[in-house]
């Protein structure tokens, strides 16, 4: 089995498409389900498959995020360049953090138009794509705390 993609409900499809386009997503396809309901499939240029679905149901009203969803993490090759690009697009990214110390990843956070949190992650050179079991084997790793809660969490 494999994870396919998350689906975010969005309030304003055009605004959301502009936001996700600014961080590098491209539209793969769109399905019109009638009554203004659309499913828009996005991916990054290097991805082979859809990695994010935007669900627009205008009759449902504005999106309310709630407390069940934390964030979407996006791997970037050049965090500084990405922050510069999103700033030029009128978006606001948080300052660069190094949650795992100097040997860990660099991260920055931003929010999409509906309030979904996006974590931008630049891994150190030589790190595998994404989080692996090796990230849990050392001390002081970057996964020890969940951003947004300000509290520390322990791994099991």
Model-derived regions, located:
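Short glycine/serine/proline-enriched coil/turn segments at secondary-structure junctions
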Residues: 34-35, 62-64, 102
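Vicinal oxygen chelate
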Residues: 2-12, 30, 40-43, 61-156, ...
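Active-site/binding-pocket entry motifs
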Residues: 48, 60-61, 126
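Conserved beta-strand in the GNAT
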Residues: 52-53, 119
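Arg/Lys-rich, alpha-helical DNA-contact motif
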Residues: 47-52, 64
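Generic beta-structure capping elements
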Residues: 45, 55-57, 123
């Amino acid at each position: 089995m494999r994870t396919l993609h998350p689906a975010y409900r969005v309030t304003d499809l055009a605004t959301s498409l502009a936001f996700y386009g600014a961080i590098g997503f491209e539209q793969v396809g769109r399905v019109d389900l009638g009554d203004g309901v659309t499913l828009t499939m996005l991916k990054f240029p290097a991805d082979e498959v859809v990695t994010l679905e935007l669900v627009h149901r205008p009759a449902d009203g504005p999106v309310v995020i709630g407390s069940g969803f934390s964030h979407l993490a996006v791997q970037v090759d050049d965090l500084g360049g990405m922050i510069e690009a999103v700033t030029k697009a009128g978006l606001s990214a948080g300052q660069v953090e190094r949650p795992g110390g100097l040997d860990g990843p660099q991260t920055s956070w931003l929010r999409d138009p509906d309030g979904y949190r996006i974590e931008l992650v630049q891994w150190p050179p030589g790190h595998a794509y994404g989080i692996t079991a090796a990230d849990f084997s050392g001390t002081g790793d970057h996964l020890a705390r969940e951003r947004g809660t300000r509290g520390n969490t322990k791994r099991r």
